């Protein structure tokens, strides 16, 4: 593969928050630690105060990997290294989308691995471990029960409740067979089919299935996969859980930050609640609310007095599940983390969280925008070249690109702006004459000019439509290029699964991403 890099704002596909982060806008400084570069990492390494229990972290990970038979030397080394004070993590997180979900799941992890490598080169006396934090406690099954591959939606049909990580994968067989059918029968297809089948077989839970699959894809590169739905890990977080439920500090802190962000035109991505924890059991994840002097679990008969709540948190910390605004704090309490790698939407809500980290005296990580990319096959590249279009052109909206193409290649003048300029000059003279004769007729003159302008605009559109018919073959090719690179009208990485790319490139696919992704350059990557 070869790579081209373009600025994010050239793609017209990213929010203003992303472009402002990439531009290192001063107004964002109160909401971050530092803007990410090698110098910032040097600073944060020296400043990071990690009070978590490293031994407990290592023990939990060893236990979580007990049923993973394929453990690379680098993976084992990284888990062991987490027990040492000179080891830090580079973390990304994601839900347990079936069959890995959209491409950006892969891109997130590749970014984390590459950044860990880059930091090791810069600071060889330290260890840097890439971490994938599985969102095993998330209960939004509708967000993770499907994936798109080759333009087809594959869905896992199940009436699911509770944490998705605890779901049994027995009923996924139909979706699995559909997915395998799209992969085909090539050698690479068979290899991936076998990998996926093993991941979800034997009635595993979804957390174990996802760990297996992510380890098969990334274990050789040292990726450590963390399932934080773990009693030992949660016990380290329980003092904050107790204090936050009772004092409702996160609600106050994050609400205040959201108001401040609104003054610089960054609007809240997440809304904190008075209590930002769920009550979690095998088939239940319900909000905790404070009502009538008691802590009530919604839609149940379960309730606690303040003293009962404290005792429950102490004895059963695993029952208390942080929501989207408290999960990042939990992550930073149990991991010796330096940076969180996320997409634009994720980093936007992290901007709301720094004040809460400061309140609880937990170090806030550097926020690193994940690598975004598009993979173009040879046929698509060929079509672009034949039409003399660049990859940057491909990001122009379809109709605008078609119009641009026609204007560049037509032998006729389709733009009537010169004619309108001439007519406008005539009308300006006419208005002066009318003004001298009867000023009350000036609006009528203006109305005639407006009608004529509309008529010229309409004629210009008709000329363009007529000329487009003369370029129908090229314009149809533009449609095909756009559909290939932007499935469903959006970025490829946000929709298409990695499966068919693995079928095409095999075991070279991820190494090619590792080769070309540059985690601290903050450019959009086009691979072809």
Predicted feature locations:
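N-terminal leader/transition segments
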Residues: 1-70, 93
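A translation/RNA-centric and nucleic-acid-associated enzymatic feature enriched
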Residues: 268-269, 273-338, 344-355, 364-366, ...
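Long, compositionally biased intrinsically disordered regions
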Residues: 3, 213, 217-304, 308-311, ...
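A structural-propensity feature for long, helix-poor, extended segments
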Residues: 141-148, 375-407
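N-terminal catalytic cores of NTP/NDP-binding nucleotidyl/phosphoryl-transfer enzymes
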Residues: 85-120, 342
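Glycine-rich phosphate/pyrophosphate-binding loops
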Residues: 102-103, 116-140, 365
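Short acidic, glycine/serine/threonine-rich loops at helix termini
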Residues: 103-104, 140-147, 236-241
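A glycine-rich helix N-cap at a beta->alpha junction
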Residues: 148-175
């Amino acid at each position: 593969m070869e790579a081209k890099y373009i600025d994010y704002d050239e793609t017209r596909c990213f929010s203003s928050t992303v472009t402002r982060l990439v531009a290192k806008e001063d107004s964002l400084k109160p909401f971050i630690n530092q803007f990410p570069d090698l110098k910032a990492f040097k600073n944060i390494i020296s400043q990071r105060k990690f009070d978590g229990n490293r031994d407990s972290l290592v023990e939990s990970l060893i236990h979580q990997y007990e049923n993973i038979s394929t453990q690379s030397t680098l993976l084992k080394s990284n888990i062991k290294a987490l027990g040492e004070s000179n080891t830090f993590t580079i973390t990304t997180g994601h839900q347990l989308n079936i069959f890995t979900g959209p491409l950006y799941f892969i891109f997130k992890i590749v970014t984390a691995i590459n950044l860990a490598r880059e930091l090791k080169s810069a600071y060889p006396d330290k260890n840097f471990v890439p971490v994938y934090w599985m969102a095993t406690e998330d209960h939004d099954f509708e967000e993770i029960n499907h994936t798109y591959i080759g333009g087809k939606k594959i869905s896992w049909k199940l009436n699911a409740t509770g944490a998705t990580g605890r779901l049994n994968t027995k009923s996924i067989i139909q979706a699995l067979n559909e997915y395998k059918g799209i992969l085909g029968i090539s050698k690479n297809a068979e290899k991936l089919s076998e990998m996926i089948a093993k991941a979800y077989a034997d009635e595993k839970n979804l957390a174990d299935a996802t760990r297996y699959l992510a380890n098969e894809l990334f274990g050789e590169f040292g990726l450590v996969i963390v399932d934080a739905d773990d009693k030992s890990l949660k016990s380290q977080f329980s003092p904050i859980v107790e204090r936050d439920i009772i004092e409702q500090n996160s609600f106050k802190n994050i609400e205040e930050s959201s108001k401040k962000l609104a003054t610089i035109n960054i609007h809240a991505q997440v809304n904190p609640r008075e209590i930002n924890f769920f009550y979690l059991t095998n088939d239940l994840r319900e909000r905790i609310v404070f009502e009538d002097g008691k802590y009530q679990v919604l839609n149940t008969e379960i309730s606690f007095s303040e003293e009962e709540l404290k005792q429950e948190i102490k004895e059963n910390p695993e029952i208390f599940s942080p929501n989207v605004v408290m999960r990042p704090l939990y992550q930073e309490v149990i991991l010796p983390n330096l940076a969180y790698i996320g997409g634009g939407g994720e980093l936007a809500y992290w901007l709301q969280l720094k004040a809460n980290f400061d309140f609880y005296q937990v170090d806030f990580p550097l926020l690193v925008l994940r690598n975004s990319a598009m993979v173009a096959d040879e046929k698509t590249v060929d079509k672009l070249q034949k039409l003399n279009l660049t990859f940057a052109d491909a990001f122009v909206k379809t109709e605008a690109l078609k119009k641009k193409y026609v204007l560049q290649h037509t032998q006729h003048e389709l733009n009537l702006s010169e004619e309108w300029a001439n007519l406008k000059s005539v009308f300006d003279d006419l208005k002066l004459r009318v003004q001298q004769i009867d000023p009350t007729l000036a609006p009528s003159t203006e109305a005639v000019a407006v009608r004529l302008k509309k008529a010229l605009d309409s004629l210009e559109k008709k000329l363009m439509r007529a000329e487009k018919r003369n370029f129908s073959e090229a314009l149809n090719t533009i449609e095909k290029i756009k559909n290939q690179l932007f499935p469903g009208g959006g970025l490829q990485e946000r929709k298409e699964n990695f499966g068919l790319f693995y079928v095409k490139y095999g075991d070279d696919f991820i190494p090619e991403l590792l080769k070309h992704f540059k985690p601290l350059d903050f450019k959009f990557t086009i691979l072809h």
